[in-house]
Amino acid sequence: MKKTSKKRAAPKAGAAGRGLRSRFAKPAGEAGGLLSGYDTGGYWCELQGHSHHALPACIELERRLDGFSIAELKKRSNAATREFMTLGVTFTVYSNRDQIDRILPFDVIPRVIPGVEWERLEAGVIQRVAAMNAFLGDIYGKQRALKDGIIPAELVLGNANYRKEMQDLPVPHGTYIHVCGTDIVRGKDGKFRVLEDNGRTPSGVSYVVENRHLMQRAFPDLVHDLPIRPVSNYGQKLAEALSQIAPAGVDDPQIVLLSPGAYNSAYFEHIFLAREMGVPLVEGRDLTVEKDRVFMKTVGGLAPVHVIYRRLNDDFLDPEVFRPDSMLGVPGLMRAYRKGNVALANAVGTGVADDKAVYAYIPRLIRYYLSEEPIIDNVETHICREPEGLKFTLDRMESLVVKPVGESGGYGVVIGPRVSKRELAEARELLTANPANYISQPMIELS
């Protein structure tokens, strides 16, 4: 719920305790309660929509909020921030030169998504991932979509994340993407849109679970007894899903979570998920391949591994096949994978499906593979490999968000209105030299 007119490139939870007073036109305690005089400024409000009254699903939450003063909200918010720091709930921003480890932002006013809205979002994400899986099965198989001109062949076969090693290699249940991070934003008009897909090694779910736990501890009187769908069983659900892709004949599979190690930006999440699933957290040096089978080194000897939930990018996964200088992967892992002796989630080669240029074709792929209309729309996207897309981007670069197509996690993104003239000039030079490597999108004015 934001009243600011500042444009944003991606949704960010409000920093704990910041700007609480500025959200409201009147001091707490005056007639009408805490939200008296609140002005949405023409933006969709997650609590009140475009009206000055609580949305049906938020009536009870707003009533409870009226029982808090600004001072009490700030006090609890600050306490929550300290607890996040104590628990180590942080993430790393490598491009931030001043502060590498950052605390997870915590908003004292929770976003409420009514059940009927959530069901539509859920259906839209399922539809999207189904199309992406069909697309991956196709491009690593008969390549019908390329032959039918649904998507340019050079965009796929020339993609840095296309893995020829996956050609004609079957995967369990035809599923390449088992865990997908779909970035969804709601604009000032109240409409949800997909900003991008993350189908390689997406992270962030641990922060959702921890945020919920902290909200329940910091504001028990705010959320107690509200009909909220649980998120604490995510680890159990993930372990069950991973068990289903174990090699044939394995009834009680050994699952491990493969991490690059403590210096990875999402290492907190790796620890969290391994603990929640009840599986070993391993690094490449903890695994070995013998006779095309994967084993884990233990004090009792070698133990067979059947499913690897990997949080390691393709390039570093197996030095025999990908980067030979990788010290993070497992030599011979792809041999075991090809033989069907171990399952990987997500599968190798999924990066081509979440490429930001391919993103622009996802609605078309949904229609092609599923014969359905997209449930959730894309954000307007300009493909710089196309002359009109390049011209549009160069002419308006200072007002657009420019993204490298093959990166993930926000790396290399240039937010036109927020960078210096020097940084914008450097980005323009890179774009002009290699337009096929970029797409652009408008700044999204968020709810």
Tell where the protein language model's regions lie, with residue ranges:
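Preference for protein termini
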Residues: 1-447
